[in-house]
Amino acid sequence: MVERLSAEARTDALRKLSGWSELDGRDAISRSFTFRDFNEAFGFMTRVALVAEKRDHHPEWRNVYRTVDVVLSTHDAGGVTLLDVELAEAMDAIAASMA
């Protein structure tokens, strides 16, 4: 089982992640992605879904038109782990490739 990050490690990881922040009231990180339109937002979600499935680590997310709101936390560990940081990095790379 993967271990939950310490507060210091989580803060350090967030410094390296663009646009991500701690979610108030939860041991989780979050970010909103905004795309040109719904098709691009859905394409992003599709690409992330393939990565998430391969890693067996899935985001909490919602999509409204061209915005995708993401929350990452590892339920089995009760908070943010390296799995969340790695998925956040992958999401950032996918979003950047679509810009």
Curated annotation (Swiss-Prot):
Keyword tags: Lyase
Listed Pfam families: Pterin_4a
UniProt-recorded Gene Ontology molecular function terms: 4-alpha-hydroxytetrahydrobiopterin dehydratase activity
Keyword Signal: no
UniProt-listed SUPFAM superfamilies: PCD-like (SSF55248)
Keyword Transferase found: no
CDD domains, alphabetized: PCD_DCoH_subfamily_b
Biological process per Gene Ontology, one example term: tetrahydrobiopterin biosynthetic process
Catalytic reaction list: (4aS,6R)-4a-hydroxy-L-erythro-5,6,7,8-tetrahydrobiopterin = (6R)-L-erythro-6,7-dihydrobiopterin + H2O
InterPro entries: PCD_sf (IPR036428), Pterin_deHydtase (IPR001533)
Domain of life (superkingdom): Bacteria
E.C. no: 4.2.1.96
Family that this chain belongs to: Belongs to the pterin-4-alpha-carbinolamine dehydratase family.
Protein name as catalogued: Putative pterin-4-alpha-carbinolamine dehydratase
Species name: Bradyrhizobium sp. (strain BTAi1 / ATCC BAA-1182)
Biological classification of the source: Bacteria, Pseudomonadati, Pseudomonadota, Alphaproteobacteria, Hyphomicrobiales
